[in-house]
Amino acid sequence: MLAARGLAVARGGRPVLEGLSFAVPPGGALVLRGPNGVGKTSLLRTLAGLAPPWAGTLQAPDAAYAGHLDGAKPALTVQENLLFWARLHGRPLDPSLLDAFALAPLRDRPAGTLSAGQGRRLALARLAATGRPLLLDEPLAALDRASADRLLLWLRAHLAGGGLAVLAVHGDLALDAPALDLAPHAADPLGAEAAFL
């Protein structure tokens, strides 16, 4: 269970979101929506434990967070990256992840040679290998339609198996999950803009 009550998050020492209350049970997902700069990434970083809450309470399990960088080890192959992350979290590598994320043909390629879309697929598969709840920031970025469809297929299976996910998106996401519009929770807009300075 991931739950927040009266949560406020900050960026650069200034609150950007406030008054957030939500709960995501096992098997559930929450889609975060809002314009650029509203605080979607700041909220995900707080849920991941990378930044403390500014105010309110937060109950969050250890989760796997995918930001804007892929986090792969460039000298390791695709398969070695997945094996590394699975073992780091005390799990065997699920070989089906290579097929689920269309990485099987790339298994022996060094991660540093992948295209942006291939690297994004590896980043998402790497998180899937951890077996943890997922916090995904723009998960469809750099993915073509076929790759996005594969991700959504895997994500639905993850949720059906009791997994949990929070996803920040700009566009439409073909996922049956409640959405939270962050715009009404924006703290002082001038303070939010100053957080980028």
Predicted features, each with a name:
Residues L2-A4, L17-G19:
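Conserved structural motif at the start of ABC-family nucleotide-binding domains
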Residues A123-L124, G162:
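Hydrophobic anchor residue at the start of the ABC signature
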Residues P110-G119:
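Conserved ABC ATPase signature
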Residues A48:
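Helix-to-loop junction immediately C-terminal to a conserved catalytic motif
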Residues R33-P35:
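The feature captures the beta-strand-to-loop junction immediately N-terminal to the Walker
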Residues E138-P139:
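Walker B catalytic motif
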Residues P92-L106, A125:
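Conserved ABC ATPase "signature" region
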Residues L69, P74-L93:
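Q-loop/switch helix immediately C-terminal to the Walker
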